[in-house]
């Protein structure tokens, strides 16, 4: 969600510069970004792509011709996790950005029986390391409530 565009806080040029900076930093570490998807709408625009609605993930799935079942979707907000869960993807919370504020909300949701398969990592680097080591599979199969996989 990039509602700052709809609210006039910044424009596409600024967002593009942010994306370019992110891609450059990742490229310097040997990584790459193949595509960036985002919702530019505000909370009251009634679009299908604003999280927690799953429209954006469905669009990604269609464009890339891949299924979403079990695909890790990493985020720092409850709406990120709910969006992933709504598509059958694997919700992954990182405890950076909004993550520390989201953690108690996740625990409350799990107490109500939702988002039980959510994995939790300290940061994106910890998630990436686990993914590259192949450790996610064991974390997924043992997930009961939240799993701190860091």
Language-model segments: which ranges?
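Short linear capping/connector segments at secondary-structure termini
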Residues: 1-5, 38-43
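A short secondary-structure junction motif
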Residues: 2-15
């Amino acid at each position: 969600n990039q509602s700052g565009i709809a609210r006039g806080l910044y424009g596409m040029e600024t967002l593009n510069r942010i994306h370019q900076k992110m891609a450059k930093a990742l490229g310097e570490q040997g990584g790459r970004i193949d595509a960036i998807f985002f919702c530019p709408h505000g909370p009251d625009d009634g679009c299908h792509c604003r999280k927690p609605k799953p429209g954006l993930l469905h669009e990604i799935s269609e464009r890339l011709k891949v299924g979403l079942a079990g695909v890790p979707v990493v985020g720092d907000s409850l709406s990120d996790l709910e969006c992933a869960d709504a598509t059958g993807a694997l919700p992954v919370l990182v405890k950076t950005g909004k993550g520390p504020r989201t953690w108690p909300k996740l625990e409350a949701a799990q107490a109500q029986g939702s988002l039980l398969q959510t994995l939790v990592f300290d940061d994106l680097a910890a998630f990436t390391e686990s993914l590259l080591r192949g450790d996610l599979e064991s974390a997924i199969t043992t997930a009961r409530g939240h799993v701190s996989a860091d």
